[in-house]
């Protein structure tokens, strides 16, 4: 599996941990090992610009997910993701460490923990999960929590 990461945020980030949590989530979701993912960490101004341009939002957001090769992600939430044998471009996850740090302070955990959560959140969006409806939110957030707990348990051994 190819995961590219670029930190253009100006914030010192443990990119190895971001890569590891993304890889864990993709592996646990059964994503084809030939899949490709890009993770971009950006500053608050660029995130606000992206949020406005692509989502119609005002101001920065924490994470954006841009699926690339939607035809190759032949599944619905909960089904095998990108299970084929051909390379698939999953897409891009864009994270804003500054927004993550603010959210982390409110949530009472570290900025790193928030970035890990947002990375998994972005992966799930690329795989077709959403949280627009209450039942979708429950399913997605429960899966997100399970994936994070599984990843954290591998780091503490």
From Swiss-Prot:
One BP term from GO: rRNA processing
Listed cofactors: Zn(2+)
InterPro entries, per database record: MetalPrtase_cat_dom_sf_prd, YbeY, YbeY_CS
EC number: 3.1.-.-
Residues annotated to bind Zn(2+): 121, 125, 131
Enzyme class, broadest EC rank: hydrolase
Protein name: Endoribonuclease YbeY
An MF annotation (GO) of this entry: metalloendopeptidase activity
Domain of life: Bacteria
Taxonomic source organism: Salinispora arenicola (strain CNS-205)
Main location as per UniProt: cytoplasm
Record has NADP as a keyword: no
Function: Single strand-specific metallo-endoribonuclease involved in late-stage 70S ribosome quality control and in maturation of the 3' terminus of the 16S rRNA.
């Amino acid at each position: 599996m190819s995961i590219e990461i670029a930190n253009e945020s100006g914030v010192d980030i443990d990119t190895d941990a971001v890569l590891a949590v993304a890889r864990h989530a993709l592996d646990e979701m059964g994503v084809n090992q030939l899949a490709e993912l890009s993770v971009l960490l950006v500053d608050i101004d660029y995130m606000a610009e992206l949020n406005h341009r692509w989502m119609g939002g005002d101001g920065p957001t924490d994470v954006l997910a841009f699926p690339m090769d939607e035809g190759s992600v032949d599944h619905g939430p909960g089904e095998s993701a990108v299970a084929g044998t051909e390379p698939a471009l999953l897409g891009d996850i864009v994270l804003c460490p500054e927004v993550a740090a603010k959210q982390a302070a409110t949530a009472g955990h570290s900025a790193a923990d928030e970035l890990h959560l947002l990375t998994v959140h972005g992966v799930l969006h690329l795989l077709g999960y959403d949280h627009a409806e209450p039942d979708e939110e429950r399913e997605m957030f429960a899966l997100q929590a399970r994936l994070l707990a599984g990843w954290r348990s591998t780091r503490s051994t």
